[in-house]
Amino acid sequence: MTRFVDQMPDTDECLFIMAGSGNISGASLQVLKFLTRKFKVNLLYIKPDHELLGRTAYLQDKICYRILQEYARSGAVSSMCLVSNSKVEEILESSLTAANYYDKINELIGYTYHMVNVFNRTKPVLDNKIENSSETRIYTIGMVDFESGEENNFFPIDNETNRCYYYAVNENLLEEDYKVLRNVNKQVKEKMKDLQGASYQIHPTKYETSFAFVEVWTSNIQTYPEE
């Protein structure tokens, strides 16, 4: 394992993707032990529908789900993004078939995670982003309707600490229409009524259609669904 990690590209960060119910999920802690020696590790945890799991897969998922959150909260890994297959299925329900089920779900997860990652590494034209506390390392991502502000989050986070909204707006619209900023401010103010903290970033794009994403953060360990 050491030889394998040594041959990986010399980048500062590493994304570790896993599903807790997989046959090799039990090896995740050992793999992470080697990865964290070289990289700042971000963890993307795909949570299966626990009601459909067999006994062994159920126990594997429950153990990994808890222990890896403890890893994140302690700082052993930089962050842990929780994604529920069931929640993503609800978002895509009208476009899913038996043949494309997993491809469509994985496509949406990958696209959303990628876009949020891009915006986190790109200078916005306007923002008031709130920095997380050192123990706030567990989160989920989601999609936001740009016009209405309706959210579709990929995991139901309990006891959230804050949210950050990422608005991607056509660059010409940003230059010509002040209503864009007014709409964003209105949405964020509405969210802040029920939250400890909410912030936003606005990014220019060349896409004709404007769209938005959200990160929902917490410093608390998320319980297993039936607990």
Mark where each language-model region is.
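Tubulin/FtsZ superfamily GTPase core signature
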Residues: 1-227
